[in-house]
Amino acid sequence: MDVEYIIVHGTFTPAHMDVSVGDLERWHVKENGWSKVGYHRLINRGGRVESILPLDEPGIHAAGFNDRSVGIALAGGQSKFNGEAVWDFNYTPYQMAVLTRELIALKAFFPNAEVVGHRDVDDRRCPGFEVKELAKCL
């Protein structure tokens, strides 16, 4: 797979909720009817990285970009505002440190890939922060 993008996502879950691969399987496969979990990597609230899909296998995480991208999801990203769920930067320092490390490693493996947020390739707010600003520091 020719990787042109490394796309960062949030799971759009509350800060108090950690997310497992099992949760993603339930949401993506059982509830959405997808053939597999959509992301290549999950970074949980404590900063642990879970590898889900091989990097040479297309994911299901960004319509129109799946066959040329790698998807990394951070657990979290949701807060309440006036009783409504909204995107928010509520990721832990551990997650951000590990995300930075993962992005550096992936850029070494895919040097021409552009690091973006899901919001940069789709009409969404995911992951709740400007990934391109983080990418400038890599």
Regions found by a protein language model. Name each.
Residues M1-E57:
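Short, conserved "active-site rim" segments that organize catalytic pockets and cofactor/ligand binding
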Residues M1-T11, R45-V49, N66-R68, A75-L138:
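Basic/polar, cationic surfaces and motifs that engage anionic cell-wall
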Residues D56-F65, I104:
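Short amphipathic alpha-helices and their capping/turn segments at secondary-structure boundaries
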